[in-house]
UniProtKB/Swiss-Prot annotation:
The species this protein was found in: Emericella nidulans (strain FGSC A4 / ATCC 38163 / CBS 112.46 / NRRL 194 / M139)
Biased composition, class Polar residues, residue ranges: 1-12
Keywords: 4Fe-4S, ATP-binding, Cytoplasm, Iron, Iron-sulfur, Metal-binding, Nucleotide-binding
Function: Component of the cytosolic iron-sulfur (Fe/S) protein assembly (CIA) machinery. Required for maturation of extramitochondrial Fe-S proteins. The nbp35-cfd1 heterotetramer forms a Fe-S scaffold complex, mediating the de novo assembly of an Fe-S cluster and its transfer to target apoproteins.
Top-level taxon in the UniProt lineage: Eukaryota
Disulphide-bridged cysteine pairs: none
Protein name per UniProt: Cytosolic Fe-S cluster assembly factor nbp35
Subunit structure: Heterotetramer of 2 nbp35 and 2 cfd1 chains.
Cofactor annotation remark: Binds 4 [4Fe-4S] clusters per heterotetramer. Contains two stable clusters in the N-termini of nbp35 and two labile, bridging clusters between subunits of the nbp35-cfd1 heterotetramer.
Compartment list: Cytoplasm
Ranges where the record places region Disordered: 1-44
């Protein structure tokens, strides 16, 4: 249930997503969480005063999953954006992907920021100062335009510079609220921006979305081997978790001069880059997106780079990635972006 108009957001965020067991002592540092399947059974549970309480807590299927499935039934495609390493431009790419899909006025797009401790999507989308609105239907996304909506923990913080210092169970609880209580309405694409790595948030999103039918994941890398090393682990995670990999995108593949559009290689692909990795791992290569300093400027100002600089090599590359993703989720690429070159 969404917070009431009289209840402060900070109070609501401090509350768990559902009533936990009545613990008799604080949770230890490596506690798996009272709601975890390993509650009372993990190595960290040995000697904990709460062990018997957690072990006897109700287990079984999450009763909220049918509610999430019903809530997202009107969302046609759900796409995860993953990266094995921080700093590869995953959130920037997520915002570009959302703007790319939304450049078709016939498509309605949402972007959900599940990077709870480092939410940057609102800034990139130009809605950082907005707050969540509540109706009888649930939480309303913050709309960037008529066909592009955003949901992020950033909208719920009293101050924009406040740190979110939460352990896994509380972060997972908020992700569940985003999926269960946000009224996305009729939507063509929901893009889920995740934190780097393979953390609780990834497991939570995957388990909660499994019944509602997640289309798959787009994995983002940069050309260097230090990034590819972590991407291999991310691909392994997807396969073990049963997440379909829609394809790999190589971000920052070169530098585009904004004056002459000449492309120079800044980060050298010492081991073949994303394209070679995709071939070796047996996954589609969706494309290479070059660096353009105007991308950072557009994100700082919360504007659409794709719309403002449509002829940039980076914009053209993003459009091709959008068409490729559309094709892999079962759409006609020509209907996804009719005017893409």
């Amino acid at each position: 249930m969404a917070p009431s108009f009289t209840e402060t957001t900070s109070t609501y965020l401090e509350a768990p997503s559902k009533a936990p067991p009545n613990l008799v002592a604080p949770e230890p540092e490596h506690c798996p969480g009272p709601e975890s399947d390993q509650a009372g059974q993990g190595d960290a549970c040995a000697g904990c005063p709460n062990q018997s309480i957690c072990a006897s807590a109700p287990k079984g299927p999450d009763p909220d999953i049918p509610l999430i499935t019903a809530r997202l039934a009107s969302v046609r495609h759900k796409i995860l954006v993953l990266s094995g390493k921080g700093g590869v431009g995953k959130s920037t790419f997520s915002s570009l992907l959302a703007h790319g899909f939304a450049s078709n006025p016939d498509s309605t797009v949402g972007i959900m920021d599940t990077d709870i401790c480092g939410p940057s999507i609102p800034k990139m989308m130009g809605v950082e100062s907005e707050t969540i609105h509540i109706s009888n239907a649930g939480w309303s996304p913050v709309w960037v335009s008529d066909n592009l909506g955003v949901m992020s923990v950033q909208f719920m913080l009293p101050n924009r510079d406040d740190a979110v210092i939460w352990r896994g169970p509380k972060k997972n609880g908020l992700i569940k609220q985003f999926l269960k209580d946000v009224d996305w309405g009729e939507m063509d694409y929901l893009i889920v921006d995740t934190p780097p790595g393979t953390s609780d948030e990834h497991l939570s999103v995957n388990s909660l979305l499994k019944e509602s039918g997640v289309d798959g994941a787009v994995v983002v890398t940069t050309p260097q081997e230090v990034s590819l090393l972590d991407v291999r682990k991310e691909i392994d995670f997807c396969r073990k978790a049963g997440i379909r990999i829609l394809g790999l995108v190589e971000n920052m593949s070169g530098f585009v001069c904004p004056s002459c559009d000449h492309e120079s290689k800044i980060f050298r692909a010492t081991t073949g880059g994303g394209k070679r990795l995709a071939k070796k791992m047996g996954i589609p290569f969706l494309g290479a997106v070059p660096l353009d300093p105007r991308v950072g400027m557009a994100c700082d100002y919360g504007e659409s780079f794709v719309e403002n600089f449509p002829d940039s090599p980076a914009s053209l590359a993003i459009k091709q990635v959008v068409r490729a993703v559309g094709r892999f989720v079962g759409e006609d690429p020509d209907s996804v972006l009719p005017d893409a070159e």
